[in-house]
Amino acid sequence: MPTKPYHVNVHELPRQSRFGGLMEETAVVMDGALLKFSWAKPADLGMTGRTAAAGKPDVHPFDQVIFLVSGRVEVTLGEGDDAETFTLEPGHLIYIPADMPHIGRVLGDEPAFGVDVFAPAREDYFDMAEHQLALERAAT
């Protein structure tokens, strides 16, 4: 895990594009957690994590918090009759327990920007934090 301080402007970090350019992401790793920064454009398609097909709920063994900075996002937790849908606006957060199916989509015409926290750190997302991890390796 990183041992060096890391100061950056997240809007200037390299981003990975998903869903045909509808979403861009980058990440920063901490000891025990990963912060993912997401920029998403409005679309009818439900956006989810890497492990699920587009439009299908994501399920993973990590606790997750989504904090919405700008835009409006609809998040559905659970599936079928047990599903519950929430609307997030700037300043809202939602906690998603590990192994809970979830999917989200941007509402309205305005893009959304949010911060996701995954604990423990999602190693399958470390490639999004390569900008940080490369500096860490170079310092040792």
List PLM regions with ranges:
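A short, N-terminal "cap"/entry segment at the start of jelly-roll beta-barrel domains
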Residues: 1-39, 44-49, 55-56, 132-140
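Structural motif
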Residues: 34, 65, 72-74, 101, ...
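Short, conserved beta-strand element in jelly-roll/cupin
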Residues: 40, 59-75, 117
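Short beta-strand segments in beta-sandwich/barrel cores
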Residues: 45-48, 54-55, 71-77, 93-94
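Short beta-strand His + acidic residue motifs that chelate non-heme Fe in jelly-roll/DSBH
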Residues: 75-76, 96, 101-108
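Short acidic-glycine-tyrosine-enriched beta hairpin
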Residues: 80-98
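Double-stranded beta-helix
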Residues: 103-140
